Amino acid sequence: MSFFSPVNQARWARFRHNRRGYWSLWLFLILSLCSLGAELLANDRPLLVQYRGQLYVPVLKNYTEQTFGGAFATAADYQDPWLQQQLATHGWALWPPVRFGATTINFASTVPFPSPPSASNWLGTDANGGDVLARILYGTRISVLFGLLLTLFSSVLGVLAGAIQGYYGGKIDLWGQRFIEVWSGMPTLFLIILLSSVVQPGFWWLLAITVLFGWMTLVGVVRAEFLRTRNYDYVRAAQALGVSDRQIILRHMLPNAMVATLTFLPFILCSSITTLTSLDFLGFGLPLGSPSLGELLLQGKNNLQAPWLGIAAFLSVAVLLTLLIFIGEAVRDAFDPSKAV
């Protein structure tokens, strides 16, 4: 920690003192890394294959059936019993813990879908025959990435707008506040429903729409900090020396405003994940068939006779959001100098 300034060292010590938030951060990082490497944990392709003395990496490269002694030049189906027998006879295959991908259907199941947890499907299957655990892994990755990107883009826009309003004040601040009041009153959900009837919803499309209407969270915080500090002596001195407004805002005033801003980021991330989950649950989110926690919740509601669907999806969302709330509380304590270590 020697590369941290004394102030940051004290903040890190206060963050670690909040044990609940500290361990929540580590658990969230572990879950995020597992979801980012979902292909290595849940896949319908082997990680590594040794066939007749040759090594193959199906998880990274596509191979045809002819590669493994088949008659056709089509893509190898590693769920095919014939191909599995070929690999077992003439070599070996290293499989991930879950032998199903995000869209793989368990055709070998003898139980109607959705099927309960079993040795092959640890958390059961959904109404379409997909493995619930695999879909949770891939759905968590989409939710975390969506939340991080939405938090990043909306925070940048919000900080920029708040900084300009707070620094210049006057008519710029007045018209900026009136615009935000009007813009924040837009019925976002109805606009998404309307646009969904015209454009096929997708990851980037949803991200753009939610950023367009979700960047106002930090404006008030940053604006208040800039209004408070713009008359400080060091700002006046910089202006008297001819320092540009851009340099004053970015180098001298923004670091002070970021102290209050950073405490909001975990809660914004939590809200971003909830937004995507809610849209998927209502049917206005990701395209049909995409791995999504909200879509699993919807399946749980529509299949009350299969409680494992709703329970697995609910626990996944609840754990993810709870960890982020605990992290947010720890970050808030870390930036509060009145908190004793």
Predicted segments with their positions:
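Alpha-helical transmembrane segments of integral membrane proteins
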Residues: 125-341
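Gly/Trp-centered helix-boundary motif
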Residues: 1-155, 159, 163-164, 289, ...
